[in-house]
Amino acid sequence: MPTVSPTPIRRAMVLAAGLGQRMRPITDNLPKPLVAIGGKPMLDHALDRLAEAGVEEAVVNVHHLAAQIEAHVAARTSPRVTISDERALLLETGGGVKKALPLLGSDPFFHVNSDSLWSETGCSNMSAMADAWDATSMDMLLLLARREGSVGFDGRGDFVRADDGLLTRRGSAERAPYVYAGVAIMKPELFADTPEGPFSLNLLFDRAIASGRLRGIVLEGQWLHVGTPDAIAPADAAFAAAAEVHA
């Protein structure tokens, strides 16, 4: 993988439209992206890290309690935020991006789940992704977390990673060493011939795997899976511990 990105990644799609059902009752009145971890709403963690990586414009989709998110990001300038409104129909992780493509332009962009959290170790993982991006060999680059050692995650893992970063699915294996950490860089061309309406990003993962063009880099730091109210305290503790180490 290259060490310098020939084309900086300047735009991002941030997914903030989900219902947050597993986070209830908190999300009955507060959208999940605005739940605070480490003293800051999860959405702000995502946007701040995008800004640190050089992203200038972010498209944020909204559905559940949309007005709260719109008001929260209204004054942001780094990155500048444009809203993609999904109040009428929640379009999932793939369909929401397809709707927003006219706002994202023709260049590769970051795709970020607004609840993607990790404690950094002094380096910017998103900057590392931008540096690793190689449009000649990749259609999509994923940020991966080590399944073992992640906070709040008890799943079987998603991907196996070769030495050159090439990714394959877990398949029939009992476990895989890496989990998708909720951040990707992707080409807009991937969305050609995709369904109208809701669909999952998994469709594009599988397309990129089939063409041998899905790669991943491993997150430096500790990934925090904040899916339920019970996961908030461990995530807060992980942020506090990281802050002490790097103070």
Model regions: which residues?
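Conserved N-terminal catalytic core of the sugar/cofactor nucleotidyltransferase
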Residues: 1-14, 22, 36, 40-113, ...
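Cofactor-binding loop segments of dinucleotide-utilizing enzymes, especially the Rossmann-like FAD-
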Residues: 17, 63, 114, 145-146, ...
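A generic "binding-loop/recognition-motif" signal
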Residues: 19, 30, 65, 87, ...
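Conserved catalytic-core motifs of eukaryotic protein kinase domains, centered on the activation segment
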Residues: 25-28
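A generic structural signal for alpha->beta connector loops
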Residues: 31, 55, 78-80, 137, ...
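Short beta-strand-to-loop element that shapes/binds the nucleotide-sugar donor at the catalytic cleft/hinge
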Residues: 64, 140-158
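Catalytic-core segments of class I nucleotidyltransferases/pyrophosphorylases
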Residues: 108-110, 117, 121-135, 147-151, ...
